[in-house]
Swiss-Prot record:
Native organism: Clostridium botulinum (strain Loch Maree / Type A3)
Gene3D superfamilies registered for this protein in UniProt: Nucleic acid-binding proteins, P-loop containing nucleotide triphosphate hydrolases, Probable gtpase engc, domain 3
Binding note for cofactor: Binds 1 zinc ion per subunit.
Coiled coil region boundaries: none
Cofactor section: Zn(2+)
Family of this protein: Belongs to the TRAFAC class YlqF/YawG GTPase family. RsgA subfamily.
UniProt keyword annotations, A-Z: Cytoplasm, GTP-binding, Hydrolase, Metal-binding, Nucleotide-binding, Ribosome biogenesis, RNA-binding, rRNA-binding, Zinc
GO molecular function, one term: metal ion binding
Chain sites annotated for binding GTP: 113-116, 164-172
NCBIfam families: ribosome small subunit-dependent GTPase A (TIGR00157)
Domain CP-type G: 64-221
Listed name of the protein: Small ribosomal subunit biogenesis GTPase RsgA
Length: 292
C-alpha cells in the first residue's frame, strides 16, 4: 500500500492511504537508520501490514523538497504569516523566512494578519519593500475571515506550510480554513507580546484538494547551515543584475563597479533588503573566520 505521512509522534508515523480515508500507524524499518534517511511529515511512502495489523514503512519515495526546521517533505509553497502589531513586526525575521523559502525553492506568499489593529498606510514602506522583492501579499483578519477565501484558493493542489513567529495567528488561520478548531489557540502574553506555544506537533491536514502543514511556533530562525554563496542566490532582486558587475563572483559588498549597489542607489532594490543581505553576509564571513 502507498500513502502520505500526515503525522509523526514518538517514532510512530501515521500514513493516510491513497484513495481512502484509512490511516495506518507504522514504524520505520531499521534499514532506514543505516541509510540515515528518516521519515518526514509529507513523505510519500510504501508500507506493509503484518498479520497482527502492525504497519511498517518499507520505502520512502524521492522528495520534491525537504525542509529541516520544520521537518517537512514535498512542500510546494509557504504562507509566511506576520502581523504589524501584537506582536510588532520584526523585519529581519521576515527576511530570514523569505531567505529560507528561496533556499528551499518554495513559493513564498506573505500574509499580514490582524489588519484590524493597524492603518495600512503606516506600513507602506515595508509593504513596498516586499512587493519590490517580487512577493505577493495578502492582508488578513483571520478572526473575522477577511480575505480567507483567497487563502483557501491558494491551498488547492498545493502542499502548503504555514510559517511565521509565534502569536501572529497561524493556528487561528488554520482553524478557519478547515472549519473547526483542530488545535488550541493561545492568547497573547501581555508581558511578552508573544503567543503561547500551543501548537505541539507538526501535522499534515487534507483540505479542499490540498494539504496543509501547521508546525510548532518559533520566534527565531537558524540560517547558519547556509554558505555565503547560497545567500547570493536567495535574494531574488539580485537576479536581474547577475553578470553586470565588474568582477566575476562579486559579493555586492565592498567591490567597486557593482551593479547591485548601483541598483540600490537608483531605487531598483530596496535599501532595507540590501542592508539585511550585508548584515547576513558579514555574519557568515565572520563565522568562517572563526572556523580557521
Amino acid at each position: 500500500m502507498k500513502g502520505t505521512i500526515i503525522k509523526g509522534i514518538g517514532g510512530f508515523y501515521y500514513i493516510k492511504i491513497d484513495n481512502s480515508e484509512e490511516i495506518i500507524e507504522c514504524k520505520a524499518r531499521g534499514k532506514f537508520r543505516h541509510t540515515e534517511l528518516t521519515p518526514m511529515i509529507g513523505d510519500y511512502v510504501e508500507i506493509s501490514v503484518d498479520k497482527n495489523n502492525k504497519g511498517a514503512i518499507e520505502k520512502i519515495y524521492e522528495r520534491r523538497s525537504e525542509l529541516f526546521r520544520p521537518a517537512v517533505a514535498n512542500v510546494t509553497q509557504a504562507l509566511v504569516v506576520f502581523s504589524f502589531k501584537n506582536p510588532d513586526i520584526n523585519i529581519d525575521l521576515l527576511n530570514k523566512f523569505l531567505l529560507l523559502c528561496e533556499y528551499n525553492n518554495l513559493k513564498a506568499i506573505v500574509c499580514f494578519n490582524k489588519m484590524d489593529l493597524v492603518n495600512k498606510e503606516d506600513y507602506k514602506d515595508i509593504i513596498s519593500m516586499i512587493e519590490q522583492a517580487g512577493y505577493d501579499i495578502i492582508f488578513l483578519n483571520a478572526k473575522e475571515e477577511r480575505n480567507m477565501d483567497i487563502i483557501k484558493k491558494l491551498i488547492k493542489d498545493n502542499v502548503t506550510v504555514f510559517c511565521g513567529p509565534s502569536g501572529v495567528g497561524k493556528s487561528t488561520m488554520l482553524n478557519k480554513i478547515i472549519g473547526k478548531e483542530t488545535m488550541i489557540t493561545g492568547n497573547i502574553s501581555e508581558k511578552l507580546k508573544r503567543g503561547k506555544h500551543t501548537t505541539r506537533h507538526s501535522e499534515l491536514i487534507y483540505v479542499d484538494e490540498g494539504l496543509l502543514v501547521d508546525t510548532p511556533g518559533f520566534s527565531s530562525l537558524d540560517i547558519n547551515f547556509m554558505e555565503k554563496e547560497d545567500l547570493l542566490h536567495c535574494i531574488p532582486e539580485f537576479r536581474d543584475f547577475i553578470g553586470e558587475c565588474k568582477f566575476t563572483g562579486c559579493l555586492h559588498h565592498r567591490e567597486p563597479n557593482c551593479a547591485v549597489k548601483k541598483a540600490v542607489e537608483e531605487g531598483h532594490i530596496h535599501k532595507n533588503r540590501y542592508d539585511f543581505y550585508i548584515k547576513t553576509l558579514e555574519e557568515f564571513m565572520n563565522r568562517r573566520k572563526k572556523k580557521w
